Amino acid sequence: MARKKAALDFEQSLADLQALVERLENGELSLEDSLTAFEQGVRLTRDCQSALTQAEQKVQVLLERDGELTEEPFDDAELPE
């Protein structure tokens, strides 16, 4: 269930980001509203990037397990430096 929620959160964040971009591109927002939308867009972009990074790291963990696909919870402490 957590995976579905994370995927939905990513999908919703991406959809929200696309909607913000469309509103900004239309040029109908005031300067203040444009700045607010831009700030929201930056937050959404960071959220999406974080979700993509975690997914990429999980794929790497799955592929690096002696040729066997095993799934483990992602932990920042396991990241190679």
From Swiss-Prot:
Enzyme Commission (EC) number: 3.1.11.6
Transmembrane segments: none
Subcellular location(s) per record: Cytoplasm
Pfam families referenced in this protein's UniProt entry, alphabetically: Exonuc_VII_S
Assigned keywords, A-Z: Cytoplasm, Exonuclease, Hydrolase, Nuclease
Source superkingdom: Bacteria
Protein name (record): Exodeoxyribonuclease 7 small subunit
Species for this entry: Pseudomonas syringae pv. tomato (strain ATCC BAA-871 / DC3000)
Gene: xseB
